């Protein structure tokens, strides 16, 4: 799905407007795109197709690439999902493409990180201040990692307390699931460090 946004009110920086067409200074947010959608974006922005396809592999590693006037930044971002009546934590790659005229974000799933910008929760956000926008995205990613790590820590402590009281498979499975989440986060954070 392709959504195009642009800051329109300089007195209210967090207010953005949804557009029908790509304009200079806009933000193109792409979620779980089809090949046709990526081809359309490529034709309208002249961004290399490998930049646009970069986030389509959920195992893609974090990196930075520069080609002509386009900059590709890939970072792993945290997600939560309901799995067997329990909240599980995972990471997926987010591609951020900085072009001469716009910012393009591409992710396999709808992200709370980007939804915060759409819903006006990020103050002093302007779609046309592309470098600043990238820094704000990275800050939001770090904020969500910290939030989820605190949640995982609290759940681990609770599960450990239950485990000390009763040695049941359910608690062991929950603890292993949390441990798996920590491994995902740790690997992604190490990868983002590069």
Functional labels for PLM-detected ranges:
Residues 1-194:
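Peripheral, non-transmembrane regulatory/ligand-interaction domains of membrane transport proteins
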């Amino acid at each position: 799905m392709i959504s195009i946004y642009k800051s329109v009110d300089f007195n209210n920086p967090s207010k953005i407007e949804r557009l029908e067409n790509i304009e200079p200074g806009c933000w193109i947010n792409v979620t779980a795109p089809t090949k046709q959608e990526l081809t359309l974006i490529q034709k309208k922005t002249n961004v290399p197709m490998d930049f646009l396809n970069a986030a389509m592999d959920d195992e893609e590693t974090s990196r930075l690439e520069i080609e002509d006037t386009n900059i590709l930044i890939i970072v792993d971002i945290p997600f939560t999902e309901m799995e067997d009546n329990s909240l599980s934590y995972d990471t997926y790659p987010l591609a951020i493409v900085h072009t001469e005229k716009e910012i393009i974000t591409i992710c396999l799933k709808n992200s709370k990180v980007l939804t915060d910008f759409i819903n006006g929760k990020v103050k002093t956000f302007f779609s046309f201040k592309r470098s600043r926008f990238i820094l704000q995205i990275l800050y939001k990613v770090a904020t969500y990692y910290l939030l989820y790590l605190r949640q995982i820590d609290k759940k681990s402590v609770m599960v450990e307390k239950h485990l000390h009281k009763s040695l049941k498979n359910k608690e062991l499975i929950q603890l292993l699931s949390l441990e798996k989440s920590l491994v995902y986060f740790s690997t992604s954070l190490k990868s983002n460090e590069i």
